[in-house]
C-alpha cells in the first residue's frame, strides 16, 4: 500500500510513510470491511461515514509539516485511524468528532492500541478545542465553505492548517494556511478533493441530500 498508493504519488516524508506502515488500518474498520482496508479507496465505517483512502490521509498529514513534538488538533475523528497516524509523528493529538457513536468507538480503539497521547472529544469541531490550544498544526477531515475563524484563532504563529474548502458541498480544494502573524495567513492550494460537509456553527448548517457528496473522514 505505502509504496504503490502513497510514495509513488508524491508523499515522501519518511515519518509519514513509517506511520502509514505501522498503524493497522484494518483495526479501525468493522469486521465485514477489513478485507478492504488497504484498497486505494474510502471504506464505509458507521453513521454513513467512511474512512478516507490511504493516500488522502498521508497527503494531509505530510502537508502539516510536523516536526515531532507538535501539538495537533484534528477535526473529524471518524474511525480514529488518521488520529493514530498523527499520534505516531506528533507530540500530542486532540481530535474532535461531532457524532457520538464515532467519537466513542474511536476513543476505545485508540486506547486499546496504546495511543495515550491522543485525546478524543465529542463536540462541534468548527469551534475547535480551545482547552488545548494553541496548536502547531490543525487538520480538518471535512469540507467547509471557509476556514472557521475559531480554528484560525487557535493556530500558533507559524502553525499550519490543512482543510478542504469549497463554495458548495460537491467538491473542495485542499488548502494549507500558514499563520504568519496575528491576522496574516498564507494560503496554498494542494489539490482537489471531495469530503463530507463540515457541519456546525462555523460550517455548513445541514448536509445536502444523501448521495450527492462523497463522504470521507479519518
UniProtKB/Swiss-Prot annotation:
Q: Which residues does the Swiss-Prot or TrEMBL record annotate as the active site? A: 52
Q: Which family does it belong to?
A: Belongs to the methyltransferase superfamily. L-isoaspartyl/D-aspartyl protein methyltransferase family.
Record field: catalytic activity: [protein]-L-isoaspartate + S-adenosyl-L-methionine = [protein]-L-isoaspartate alpha-methyl ester + S-adenosyl-L-homocysteine
Q: Which PROSITE patterns does this chain map to?
A: PCMT
What cellular component GO annotations does this protein have? cytoplasm
- Keyword tags: Cytoplasm, Methyltransferase, S-adenosyl-L-methionine, Transferase
Q: Where is the signal peptide?
A: none
Enzyme class name: transferase
Chief location: cytoplasm
Which NCBIfam families does the record cross-reference, listed alphabetically? pimt (TIGR00080), PRK00312.1 (NF001453)
GO process terms (BP): methylation; protein modification process; protein repair
Q: Which InterPro entries does this one have?
A: PCMT (IPR000682), SAM-dependent_MTases_sf (IPR029063)
- Say yes or no: keyword Signal present: no
The molecular function terms of the Gene Ontology recorded here are: protein-L-isoaspartate (D-aspartate) O-methyltransferase activity
List the HAMAP family hit by this protein, alphabetically.
PIMT (MF_00090)
The protein in question is named Protein-L-isoaspartate O-methyltransferase
Report if keyword S-adenosyl-L-methionine is assigned. yes
Ranked from the top, the taxonomy reads:
Bacteria, Pseudomonadati, Pseudomonadota, Alphaproteobacteria, Hyphomicrobiales
EC numbers on record:
2.1.1.77
Q: Which compartments does it reside in?
A: Cytoplasm
Protein role: Catalyzes the methyl esterification of L-isoaspartyl residues in peptides and proteins that result from spontaneous decomposition of normal L-aspartyl and L-asparaginyl residues. It plays a role in the repair and/or degradation of damaged proteins.
Amino acid at each position: 500500500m505505502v509504496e504503490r498508493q502513497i510514495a509513488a504519488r508524491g508523499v515522501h516524508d519518511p515519518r509519514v510513510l513509517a506511520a502509514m506502515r505501522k498503524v493497522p488500518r484494518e483495526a479501525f474498520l468493522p469486521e465485514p470491511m477489513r478485507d478492504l482496508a488497504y484498497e486505494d479507496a474510502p471504506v464505509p465505517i458507521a453513521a454513513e461515514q467512511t474512512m478516507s483512502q490511504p493516500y488522502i490521509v498521508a497527503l494531509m498529514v505530510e502537508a502539516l509539516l510536523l516536526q515531532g513534538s507538535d501539538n495537533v488538533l484534528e477535526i473529524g475523528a471518524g474511525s480514529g485511524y488518521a488520529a493514530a497516524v498523527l499520534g505516531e509523528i506528533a507530540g500530542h493529538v486532540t481530535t474532535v468528532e461531532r457524532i457520538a457513536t464515532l467519537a466513542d468507538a474511536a476513543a476505545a480503539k485508540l486506547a486499546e492500541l496504546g495511543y495515550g497521547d491522543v485525546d478524543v472529544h465529542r463536540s462541534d469541531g468548527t469551534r475547535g478545542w480551545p482547552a488545548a490550544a494553541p496548536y502547531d498544526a490543525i487538520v480538518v477531515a471535512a469540507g467547509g465553505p471557509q476556514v472557521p475563524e475559531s480554528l484560525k484563532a487557535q493556530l500558533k504563529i507559524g502553525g499550519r492548517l490543512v482543510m478542504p474548502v469549497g463554495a458548495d458541498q460537491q467538491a473542495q480544494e485542499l488548502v494549507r494556511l500558514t499563520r504568519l502573524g496575528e491576522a496574516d495567513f498564507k494560503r496554498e492550494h494542494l489539490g482537489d478533493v471531495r469530503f463530507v460537509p463540515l457541519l456546525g456553527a462555523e460550517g455548513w448548517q445541514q448536509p445536502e441530500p444523501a448521495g450527492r457528496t462523497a463522504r470521507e473522514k479519518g
